[in-house]
């Protein structure tokens, strides 16, 4: 049984909901707290976490009268205690404290801790059967098979919190899984949508960071420019909705108004539209199975004027093709894909490789991993973290030769 509820079969939520926000001071956390701030009568904050932003975490914990606050950096425990002195708010520091925050009793958890560090806290929330709004890609890209199984076993409810998968989640409610023929994930095309391949190869960091529609962090903006981010979303959709690679299509939609579509057997296509504002999918998750009053601007289609669509160019954006290759390879290949991309993006930011070499490093790492016969199923979070670590080391080893070829 899927942990993602494809039909709204739950009764409407009643009473005050206890919520936990993992990654409260990041961009997703900020949007979540903005929505909580607007409806204080509906929610009580149980726990908040942050990576290292003690001041921001303490401010939020006091504002929302949280019962527990945790900072991932263990060395900052003294700072957090000082910031919360006299408030009565419990606090902790280190990985264990973040996991404790996730394990504390609450009805709803926003899992927005970035990177592989978010996997164990998300699992702690899943294991107690919580409703989890999932914004951490690594849970699915690096560990999707066992993560979704754990969620199903614990009868946890997984709500997709990013815009594309939340759009699919909403559209899928229009039919049964057996009636689905395909899902369509939209992509803006990024800043290089109309660029020639030779120009993309030589693109600078400043150019890669000029996203036409979304305001995001550095890593995800670079991933959008390479379309690696869309590749990661294809992998996430595979695990969230139990889809084969052939059932997942990517369409370039420069306006970023339609975020996802679902085609059913009668050839009806159901789409979800909204302004490019992360508060929209988060509000859907926060209110589910009800709807709450949103904070994003209303959509005015007359001002947009037109919605256009293009096929993605796999030759100019090979990162997207590689995601499908990794899915078809199976098991831990998607973990390797993600790890190699993280190493490649970091190298690009440091000007060690050209933009075009990002996908080449990912491809070489994937191929080397598969040739070595290292594909194996992942049975635990530690397995996923181990593969992630080894794949990063492999990508780092291959980096000099990729850089040399481009010079």
UniProtKB/Swiss-Prot annotation:
Binding positions for NADPH per the UniProt entry: 25-28, 53, 136, 138, 217
Entry keywords, A to Z: Isoprene biosynthesis, Manganese, Metal-binding, NADP, Oxidoreductase
Catalysed reaction equations from the record: 2-C-methyl-D-erythritol 4-phosphate + NADP(+) = 1-deoxy-D-xylulose 5-phosphate + NADPH + H(+)
UniProt-listed InterPro entries: DXP_reductoisomerase, DXP_reductoisomerase_C, DXP_reductoisomerase_N, DXPR_C, DXPR_C_sf, NAD(P)-bd_dom_sf
GO MF annotation list: 1-deoxy-D-xylulose-5-phosphate reductoisomerase activity; manganese ion binding; NADPH binding
Pathway connected to this protein: Isoprenoid biosynthesis; isopentenyl diphosphate biosynthesis via DXP pathway; isopentenyl diphosphate from 1-deoxy-D-xylulose 5-phosphate: step 1/6
SUPFAM superfamilies per UniProt: 1-deoxy-D-xylulose-5-phosphate reductoisomerase, C-terminal domain (SSF69055), Glyceraldehyde-3-phosphate dehydrogenase-like, C-terminal domain (SSF55347), NAD(P)-binding Rossmann-fold domains (SSF51735)
Tree of life domain: Bacteria
Function: Catalyzes the NADPH-dependent rearrangement and reduction of 1-deoxy-D-xylulose-5-phosphate (DXP) to 2-C-methyl-D-erythritol 4-phosphate (MEP).
Protein family per UniProt: Belongs to the DXR family.
Protein name: 1-deoxy-D-xylulose 5-phosphate reductoisomerase
Organism of origin: Rhodopseudomonas palustris (strain BisA53)
């Amino acid at each position: 049984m899927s942990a993602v509820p494809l039909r709204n079969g739950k009764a409407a939520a009643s009473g005050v909901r206890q919520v936990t926000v993992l990654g409260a001071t990041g961009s997703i956390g900020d949007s979540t707290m903005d929505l909580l701030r607007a409806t204080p009568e509906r929610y009580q904050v149980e726990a908040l976490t942050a990576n290292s932003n003690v001041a921001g975490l303490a401010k939020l914990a006091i504002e929302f009268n949280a019962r527990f606050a945790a900072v991932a950096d263990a060395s900052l425990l003294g700072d957090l205690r000082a910031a919360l002195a006299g408030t009565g708010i419990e606090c902790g520091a280190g990985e264990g404290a973040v996991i404790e925050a996730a394990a504390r009793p609450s009805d709803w958890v926003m899992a927005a801790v970035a990177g592989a560090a978010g996997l164990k806290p998300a699992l702690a929330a899943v294991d107690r059967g919580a409703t989890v709004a999932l914004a951490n890609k690594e849970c699915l890209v690096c560990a999707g098979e066992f993560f979704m199984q754990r969620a199903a076993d614990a009868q946890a409810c997984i709500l997709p919190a990013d815009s594309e998968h939340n759009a699919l989640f909403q559209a899928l409610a229009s039919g049964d899984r057996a009636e689905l023929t395909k899902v369509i994930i939209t992509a803006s095309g990024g800043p290089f949508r109309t660029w020639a391949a030779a120009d993309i190869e030589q693109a600078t960091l400043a150019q890669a960071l000029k996203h036409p529609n979304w305001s995001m962090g550095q890593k995800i903006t670079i991933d959008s420019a390479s379309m690696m981010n869309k590749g990661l979303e294809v992998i996430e959709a595979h695990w969230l909705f139990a889809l084969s690679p052939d059932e997942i299509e990517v369409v370039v939609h420069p306006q970023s108004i339609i975020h996802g579509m679902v085609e059913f057997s009668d050839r009806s296509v159901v789409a979800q539209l909204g302004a490019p504002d992360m508060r929209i999918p988060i509000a859907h998750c926060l209110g589910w199975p009800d709807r709450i009053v949103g904070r994003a601007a209303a959509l005015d289609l007359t001002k947009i004027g037109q919605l256009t669509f293009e096929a993605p160019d796999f030759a100019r954006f090979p990162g997207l093709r590689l995601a499908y290759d990794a899915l078809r390879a199976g098991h831990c290949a998607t973990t390797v894909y993600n790890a190699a991309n993280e190493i490649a993006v970091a190298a690009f930011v440091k000007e060690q490789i050209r933009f075009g070499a990002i996908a080449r490093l990912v491809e070489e790492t994937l191929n080397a991993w598969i040739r070595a016969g290292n594909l194996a199923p992942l049975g635990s979070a530690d397995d996923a973290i181990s593969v992630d670590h080894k794949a990063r080391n492999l990508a780092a080893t291959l980096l000099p030769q990729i850089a040399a070829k481009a010079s």
